[in-house]
Amino acid sequence: MSEKIWISVCEYQDLLPDTGLCALVNKQQVALFNSRRLNEVFAVSNFDPIGEANVLSRGILGSIGDEIVVASPLYKQHFNLRTGECLEKPEYNIAVYPVRVEDGLVQVLV
């Protein structure tokens, strides 16, 4: 098994608050979100398993109760950005990646 490494994907200033950005990381599309309210960056798979398309980076960032979510632009289902679970259909989930900001760069652990 290969060791995981932190990969720089963009500058933090390129990740606008409350919007998504898609990056290709090790041949995987990763959706990045910068929550202004939480002052936190999230990284999840860009693939919507219900709509079967790489679109989550175009989704709407928000919250339901205490959960930070992204609403898919296709069928509007909500995915928890911390756990990857779909709130409406828990049998579906998306990959969640560790993410950090180091020296002004957004990095994903893959």
Residue ranges and their predicted role:
Residues M1-E67, N93-V110:
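N-terminal pre-ligand scaffold of iron-sulfur
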Residues K76-P98:
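C-terminal structural segments of small proteins and small subunits
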Residues D48, S72-Y75:
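Short cysteine clusters
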